[in-house]
C-alpha cells in the first residue's frame, strides 16, 4: 500500500546538514500528552476498561476501575500544573498532544496551555487506539478531535499523533483532511517525508523511550532514572549535532512525571539543557513548518 512500504535505509550515514534556526545543534521538543478524562472506562460506556495503568487490579472489563480513574484524575488535578510550573521556571516552550474530550473536561488547563503559548497536536477525541477502526470511524475520530481542539483553543491543528496502533489508512486520512504532518513513527532522529496519494507528507518522529511512560512499564523508578536517560540521549545528540544537527523529543504525561517524586527528573533535565548553547527548544509545529519551508 502506498505510503506504508518499510524503509530500512533512511538517511543512512549521510544525514542532511540541517541548518536549525540560530545554528542550533539540536532541536528539542517537550511534549505533554494531555489524555486524562478521555481514556477507556466503563463510566464512558466502553466494553473494556483502561489497561494502561501503574497498577492493574483484578476487575471485570465492564466494571469501573476506581483506582485507575483516580490516578488519571491526579494528572489533570495536580500533575499538569506541576509540569507547567517547571517548564515556566526554565522558560521552556512545549507542545501538547491533546485529546479533545480531555480538554473539554478541564477548560482551565486548556486556557493555561493557550496562555503559555503551547502548540496543539491532535491526539484523538478519545484516547483510544485506531486499531480495528474502519476508515469512516477513523475519519470521524480525526474530525471530532480537530473540531474540539480548535473550538476550545482557537488553534488550527496541523499535526497528529495516534494512540498506537494506527492503521494503514491513518496517514492517508490525515493528508486528505489537510494535516501537514504526523508523528506516528519512531524511526529517525530527524523529520522525513513519506509519499501519500502521490504527494510528499511530512513525518516528525516521536519517542517512546525518551518518555516518562516507562515508569508505568516498570523500566524506571526514581527521578534520576528519567533524568539520566534523557540527559544521556541529549548529550549524544548534542555531540553529533556539531557536524549533523539532530532533533529530540521528550514525552511527558501529567499522571506520571507530574508526581512529586518524579517531577525532579524533568527539573534536573531542563537545568542541564540550559547550560548549553546551540539548543533550539521549540514547538513541534515550528519544527514541521521549518522543515516544510526548507526541505519540502
PLM regions and their residue ranges:
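Catalytic alpha-helical scaffold of carbohydrate-active enzymes acting on polysaccharides/glycoconjugates
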Residues: 2-159, 163-202, 227-250, 256-296
Amino acid at each position: 500500500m502506498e505510503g506504508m512500504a518499510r524503509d530500512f535505509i533512511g538517511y543512512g550515514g549521510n544525514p542532511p546538514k540541517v541548518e536549525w534556526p540560530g545554528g542550533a545543534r539540536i532541536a528539542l521538543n517537550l511534549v505533554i500528552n494531555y489524555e486524562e478524562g478521555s481514556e477507556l472506562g466503563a463510566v464512558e460506556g466502553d466494553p473494556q476498561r483502561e489497561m494502561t495503568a501503574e497498577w492493574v487490579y483484578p476487575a471485570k472489563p465492564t466494571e469501573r476501575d476506581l483506582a485507575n480513574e483516580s490516578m488519571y484524575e491526579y494528572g489533570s488535578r495536580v500533575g499538569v500544573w506541576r509540569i507547567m510550573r517547571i517548564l515556566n521556571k526554565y522558560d521552556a516552550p512545549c507542545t501538547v498532544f491533546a485529546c479533545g474530550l480531555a480538554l473539554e473536561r478541564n477548560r482551565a488547563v486548556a486556557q493555561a496551555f493557550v496562555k503559555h503559548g503551547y502548540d496543539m497536536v491532535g491526539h484523538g477525541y478519545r484516547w483510544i487506539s485506531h486499531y480495528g477502526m474502519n476508515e469512516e470511524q477513523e475519519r470521524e475520530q480525526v474530525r471530532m478531535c480537530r473540531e474540539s481542539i480548535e473550538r476550545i483553543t482557537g488553534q488550527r491543528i496541523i499535526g497528529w499523533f495516534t494512540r498506537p496502533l494506527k492503521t494503514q489508512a491513518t496517514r492517508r486520512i490525515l493528508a486528505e483532511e489537510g494535516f501537514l504532518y504526523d508523528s506516528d513513527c519512531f524511526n529517525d532522529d530527524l523529520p522525513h517525508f513519506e509519499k501519500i496519494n502521490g504527494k510528499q507528507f511530512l513525518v516528525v518522529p516521536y519517542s517512546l523511550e525518551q518518555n516518562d511512560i516507562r515508569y508505568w512499564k516498570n523500566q524506571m523508578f526514581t527521578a534520576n532514572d528519567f533524568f539520566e536517560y534523557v540527559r544521556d540521549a541529549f548529550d549524544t545528540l548534542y555531540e553529533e549535532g556539531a557536524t549533523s544537527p539532530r532533533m529530540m523529543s521528550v514525552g511527558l504525561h501529567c499522571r506520571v512525571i507530574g508526581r512529586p517524586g518524579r517531577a525532579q527528573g524533568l527539573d534536573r533535565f531542563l537545568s542541564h539543557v540550559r547550560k548549553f548553547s546551540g539548543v533550539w527548544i521549540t514547538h513541534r509545529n515550528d519544527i514541521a513548518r521549518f522543515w516544510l519551508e526548507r526541505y519540502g
